[in-house]
């Protein structure tokens, strides 16, 4: 593959420094209007970046979103001995070139893992490629327990030896991972991806049953197969991987971010505006657009664009999160913000993560009427919200507070916005382009 002009070596001092004192100031009462492009999918890019460690060849990854989680993953790859070059930024992301022919590390410390839970994706590739990894327990958003037992049990089934000591997971394999049958007690997206990456270089065939079906898993399969892997079944609940001895160079474009796309459609709905999201795969957001229609939003789809036209006031609707193709848990906080000003009572049930109603406390500061118990929230819509100072508890919850601030009367200040930087590229610019008044201070 020819090297395009303009590529430069990414500096080791990657731009992922946490700035907890930064905040957003959002002016309420605006109707968003216009078009907005969708970035590459965060939840597809992260496992694909980890999968680049599986080959000594060159991995060219287009449409990688320039967000903090990707920056952290790039720095981890540097730490492990990979070389990463970053090209000019496009509308939806950048091109990254990765060469992992000189891996010289197997440890991922707490300074990285506390930043990002997705660092766990490195276990499968490193075990498959070099046979060893020592990794601190992953961090990320504080949205309740996300046990990594699915990952560990699956890797053990493939032949890995795993010990947990002093806050670290130490895993090794004597010679080569061995193909086997794995049944996941829950269709975990991360575990499915980790086991796929581990199994592509294993000896024999691996079958993953009750696998997650998310589009990001289909994208990972496409990336792996372009490297020379033999994976089939992604998008279904049974995935089969025939191990190969070596993988080669690859060029791949990351799919659009369905959560970002759905979030901008929700922004149109809550503000009574009209927003066209460009560069989306419409079927990836079907569960969200169906719910927005139920709430009174007009949805139009054509090609790779989706338009949402919000009503004067939304109607209440019940939401239950489920594994794909059900309603995504990463859109549940945003839907709570919409329900807070809808006409009627909405019942929101969270079945994926525990403790994902933290945004309810902050929405109540703005005048929302929300009662939570366990995994259920009852949201009685109010005619209007009032601007307030609120604290961002996690990535998607922070976006929910921005949506509420756009709808509220007056000015809303959102603190601890470093969470939001983990998942949205050029957020202020995109919202400003749609007519929002939002500033980072």
UniProtKB/Swiss-Prot annotation:
Top EC class, one word: transferase
Active-site residues annotated for this sequence: 141 (proton donor)
Involved pathway(s): Cell wall biogenesis; peptidoglycan biosynthesis
Pfam families, sorted: EPSP_synthase (PF00275)
Reaction(s) catalysed (UniProt annotation): phosphoenolpyruvate + UDP-N-acetyl-alpha-D-glucosamine = UDP-N-acetyl-3-O-(1-carboxyvinyl)-alpha-D-glucosamine + phosphate
Keywords (A to Z) from UniProt: Cell cycle, Cell division, Cell shape, Cell wall biogenesis/degradation, Cytoplasm, Peptidoglycan synthesis, Pyruvate, Transferase
Residues annotated to bind phosphoenolpyruvate: 42-43
Database matches in Gene3D superfamilies: Enolpyruvate transferase domain
Keyword Lipid metabolism: no
Residue positions, PTM 2-(S-cysteinyl)pyruvic acid O-phosphothioketal: 141
Chain sites annotated for binding UDP-N-acetyl-alpha-D-glucosamine: 117, 330, 352
InterPro entries: Enolpyruvate_Tfrase_dom (IPR001986), Enolpyruvate_Tfrase_sf (IPR036968), MurA_subfamily (IPR050068), RNA3'P_cycl/enolpyr_Trfase_a/b (IPR013792), UDP_GlcNAc_COvinyl_MurA (IPR005750)
Sequence intervals crossing the membrane: none
MF annotations from Gene Ontology: UDP-N-acetylglucosamine 1-carboxyvinyltransferase activity
Cleaved signal peptide residues: none
Subcellular location per the Swiss-Prot or TrEMBL entry: Cytoplasm
GO cellular component terms, semicolon-separated: cytoplasm
Known role: Cell wall formation. Adds enolpyruvyl to UDP-N-acetylglucosamine.
Classification via HAMAP family: MurA
Similarity remark: Belongs to the EPSP synthase family. MurA subfamily.
Record's protein name: UDP-N-acetylglucosamine 1-carboxyvinyltransferase 1
Gene: murA1
């Amino acid at each position: 593959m020819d090297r395009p002009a303009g590529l430069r070596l990414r500096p080791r001092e990657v731009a992922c420094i946490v700035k907890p004192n930064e905040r957003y100031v959002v002016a309420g009462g605006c109707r968003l209007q216009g078009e907005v492009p969708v970035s590459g999918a965060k939840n597809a890019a992260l496992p694909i970046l980890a999968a680049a460690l599986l080959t000594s060849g060159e991995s060219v990854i287009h449409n990688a979103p320039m967000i903090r989680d990707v920056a952290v993953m790039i720095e981890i790859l540097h730490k492990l001995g990979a070389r990463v070059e970053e090209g000019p930024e496009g509308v939806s992301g950048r091109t990254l070139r990765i060469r992992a022919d000189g891996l010289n590390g197997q440890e991922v410390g707490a300074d990285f893992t506390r930043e990002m839970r997705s660092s766990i994706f490195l276990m499968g590739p490193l075990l498959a490629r070099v046979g060893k990894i020592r990794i601190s327990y992953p961090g990320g958003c504080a949205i309740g327990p996300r046990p990594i037992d699915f990952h560990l049990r699956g890797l053990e089934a493939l032949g890995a030896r795993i010990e947990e000591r002093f806050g670290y997971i130490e895993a090794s394999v004597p010679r080569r991972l061995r193909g086997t049958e794995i049944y996941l007690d829950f269709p975990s997206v991360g575990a499915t991806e980790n086991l796929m990456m581990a199994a592509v270089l294993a000896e024999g065939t691996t079958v993953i049953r009750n696998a997650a079906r998310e589009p990001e898993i289909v994208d990972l399969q496409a990336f792996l197969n372009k490297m020379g892997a033999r994976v089939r079944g992604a998008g279904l609940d049974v995935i089969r991987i025939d191990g190969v001895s070596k993988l080669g160079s690859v060029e791949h474009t990351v799919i659009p971010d369905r959560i970002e796309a759905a979030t901008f459609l929700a922004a149109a709905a809550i503000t009574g505006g009209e927003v066209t999201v460009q560069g989306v795969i419409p079927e990836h957001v079907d569960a969200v657009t169906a719910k927005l229609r139920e709430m009174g939003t007009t949805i139009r789809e054509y090609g790779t664009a989706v338009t949402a036209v919000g009503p004067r006031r939304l109607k209440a609707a019940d939401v239950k999160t489920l594994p794909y193709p059900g309603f995504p848990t990463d859109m549940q906080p945003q839907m709570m913000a919409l329900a807070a000003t809808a006409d009627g009572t909405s019942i929101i049930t969270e079945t994926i993560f525990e403790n994902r109603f933290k945004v309810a406390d902050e929405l109540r500061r703005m005048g929302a009427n929300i009662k939570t118990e366990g995994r259920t929230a009852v949201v009685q819509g109010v005619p209007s919200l009032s601007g307030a100072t609120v604290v961002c508890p996690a990535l998607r919850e922070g976006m929910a507070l921005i949506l509420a601030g756009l709808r509220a009367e007056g000015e809303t200040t959102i603190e601890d916005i470093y969470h939001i930087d983990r998942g949205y590229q050029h957020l202020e610019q995109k919202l400003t382009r749609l007519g929002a008044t939002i500033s980072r201070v």
